[in-house]
Swiss-Prot record:
Biased composition (Polar residues): 39-50
Superkingdom: Eukaryota
Keyword list, A-Z: Secreted, Signal
Endpoints of the signal sequence: 1-18
Tissue: Expressed by the venom gland (anterior main gland) (at protein level).
Localization annotation: Secreted
Keyword Secreted: yes
Residue ranges, annotated region (Disordered): 25-50
Annotated GO CC locations: extracellular region
Membrane-traversing stretches: none
Protein's UniProt name: Venom hemolysin-like protein 1
């Protein structure tokens, strides 16, 4: 539910162009959102203050949602005997958080900036790291398959981050598709491990605990970067 709410907030920042892919598919052109009405007197309204108010509201909303998810993850890890089921839930949460904030940053275009893209990629990598941990503790071909998914997902996030930071005003839709793909792979892998490994061992539990610590640390780091986004918005000349 919270992830869906994040996506609603992401809608506030829609501003991207179509981007072709290898399979010939392209992403449609979403229309650029109009800033919300300002309650100040019209004589004091400026483009800068309106934009900063809009972005600040969106960032605060997303930040609150992410922090709520982080608290849930921390509490869950403290429960004895969580096993693979809780580990899969935490892994999926990491994917949702990372892709959600990554989309918000990318689709915000130049208004959000490279710092937001970096924050989203950082958090997405926390989820990918947990997927990789599953691969380390699983036997044979299953473990190798899981690690292959993690490696590929990591490369996709890096590519989306690099493209987004380099040409923010042009590739919001490209980054959006990349992050969504990673999100689905994280969830699929976590669910597969959850159903395949149906017993609790000390090694699995240890992996979950270590992964959860990494996840929550990544969330805290991302929250700090989100707070900096608004502070680093530079006033732009208001054109007639």
């Amino acid at each position: 539910m919270q992830y869906k709410l994040i996506l609603l907030v992401v809608g506030l920042f829609q501003a991207s162009l179509a981007y072709p892919y290898a399979d010939g598919e392209s992403v449609p052109h979403p229309s650029k959102d109009v800033a919300p009405p300002d309650t100040q007197d019209s004589s004091t309204q400026t483009e800068v203050t309106t934009q900063k108010g809009w972005i600040k509201q969106g960032v605060e909303t997303i930040t609150g949602m992410i922090k709520g998810q982080a608290d849930i993850a921390k509490d869950a890890v403290g429960i004895a005997g969580t096993g693979t089921h809780m580990g899969a839930k935490i892994t999926s949460a990491a994917g949702e958080l990372g892709t959600g904030i990554g989309n918000a940053a990318l689709q915000g275009g130049l208004q959000i900036g490279a710092m937001g893209v970096e924050a989203g990629a950082n958090l997405a990598h926390q989820g990918i790291g947990l997927v990789d941990k599953w691969g380390q503790i699983l036997p044979g071909f299953l473990g190798k398959g899981v690690q292959s998914v993690a490696n590929l997902a990591g490369n996709i996030v890096d590519k989306a981050e690099n493209i987004g930071k380099g040409v923010l005003e042009k590739v919001g839709a490209a980054g959006d598709k990349g992050f969504k793909w990673v999100d689905s792979k994280i969830k699929d892998t976590a669910n597969s491990v959850d159903t395949t490994v149906n017993h609790i061992t000390g090694k699995i539990q240890e992996g979950i605990d270590k992964g959860a610590n990494t996840l929550t640390g990544g969330i805290d780091n991302t929250l700090g970067k989100l707070k900096d986004i608004v502070n680093n918005i530079r006033p732009k000349p208001v054109t007639a």
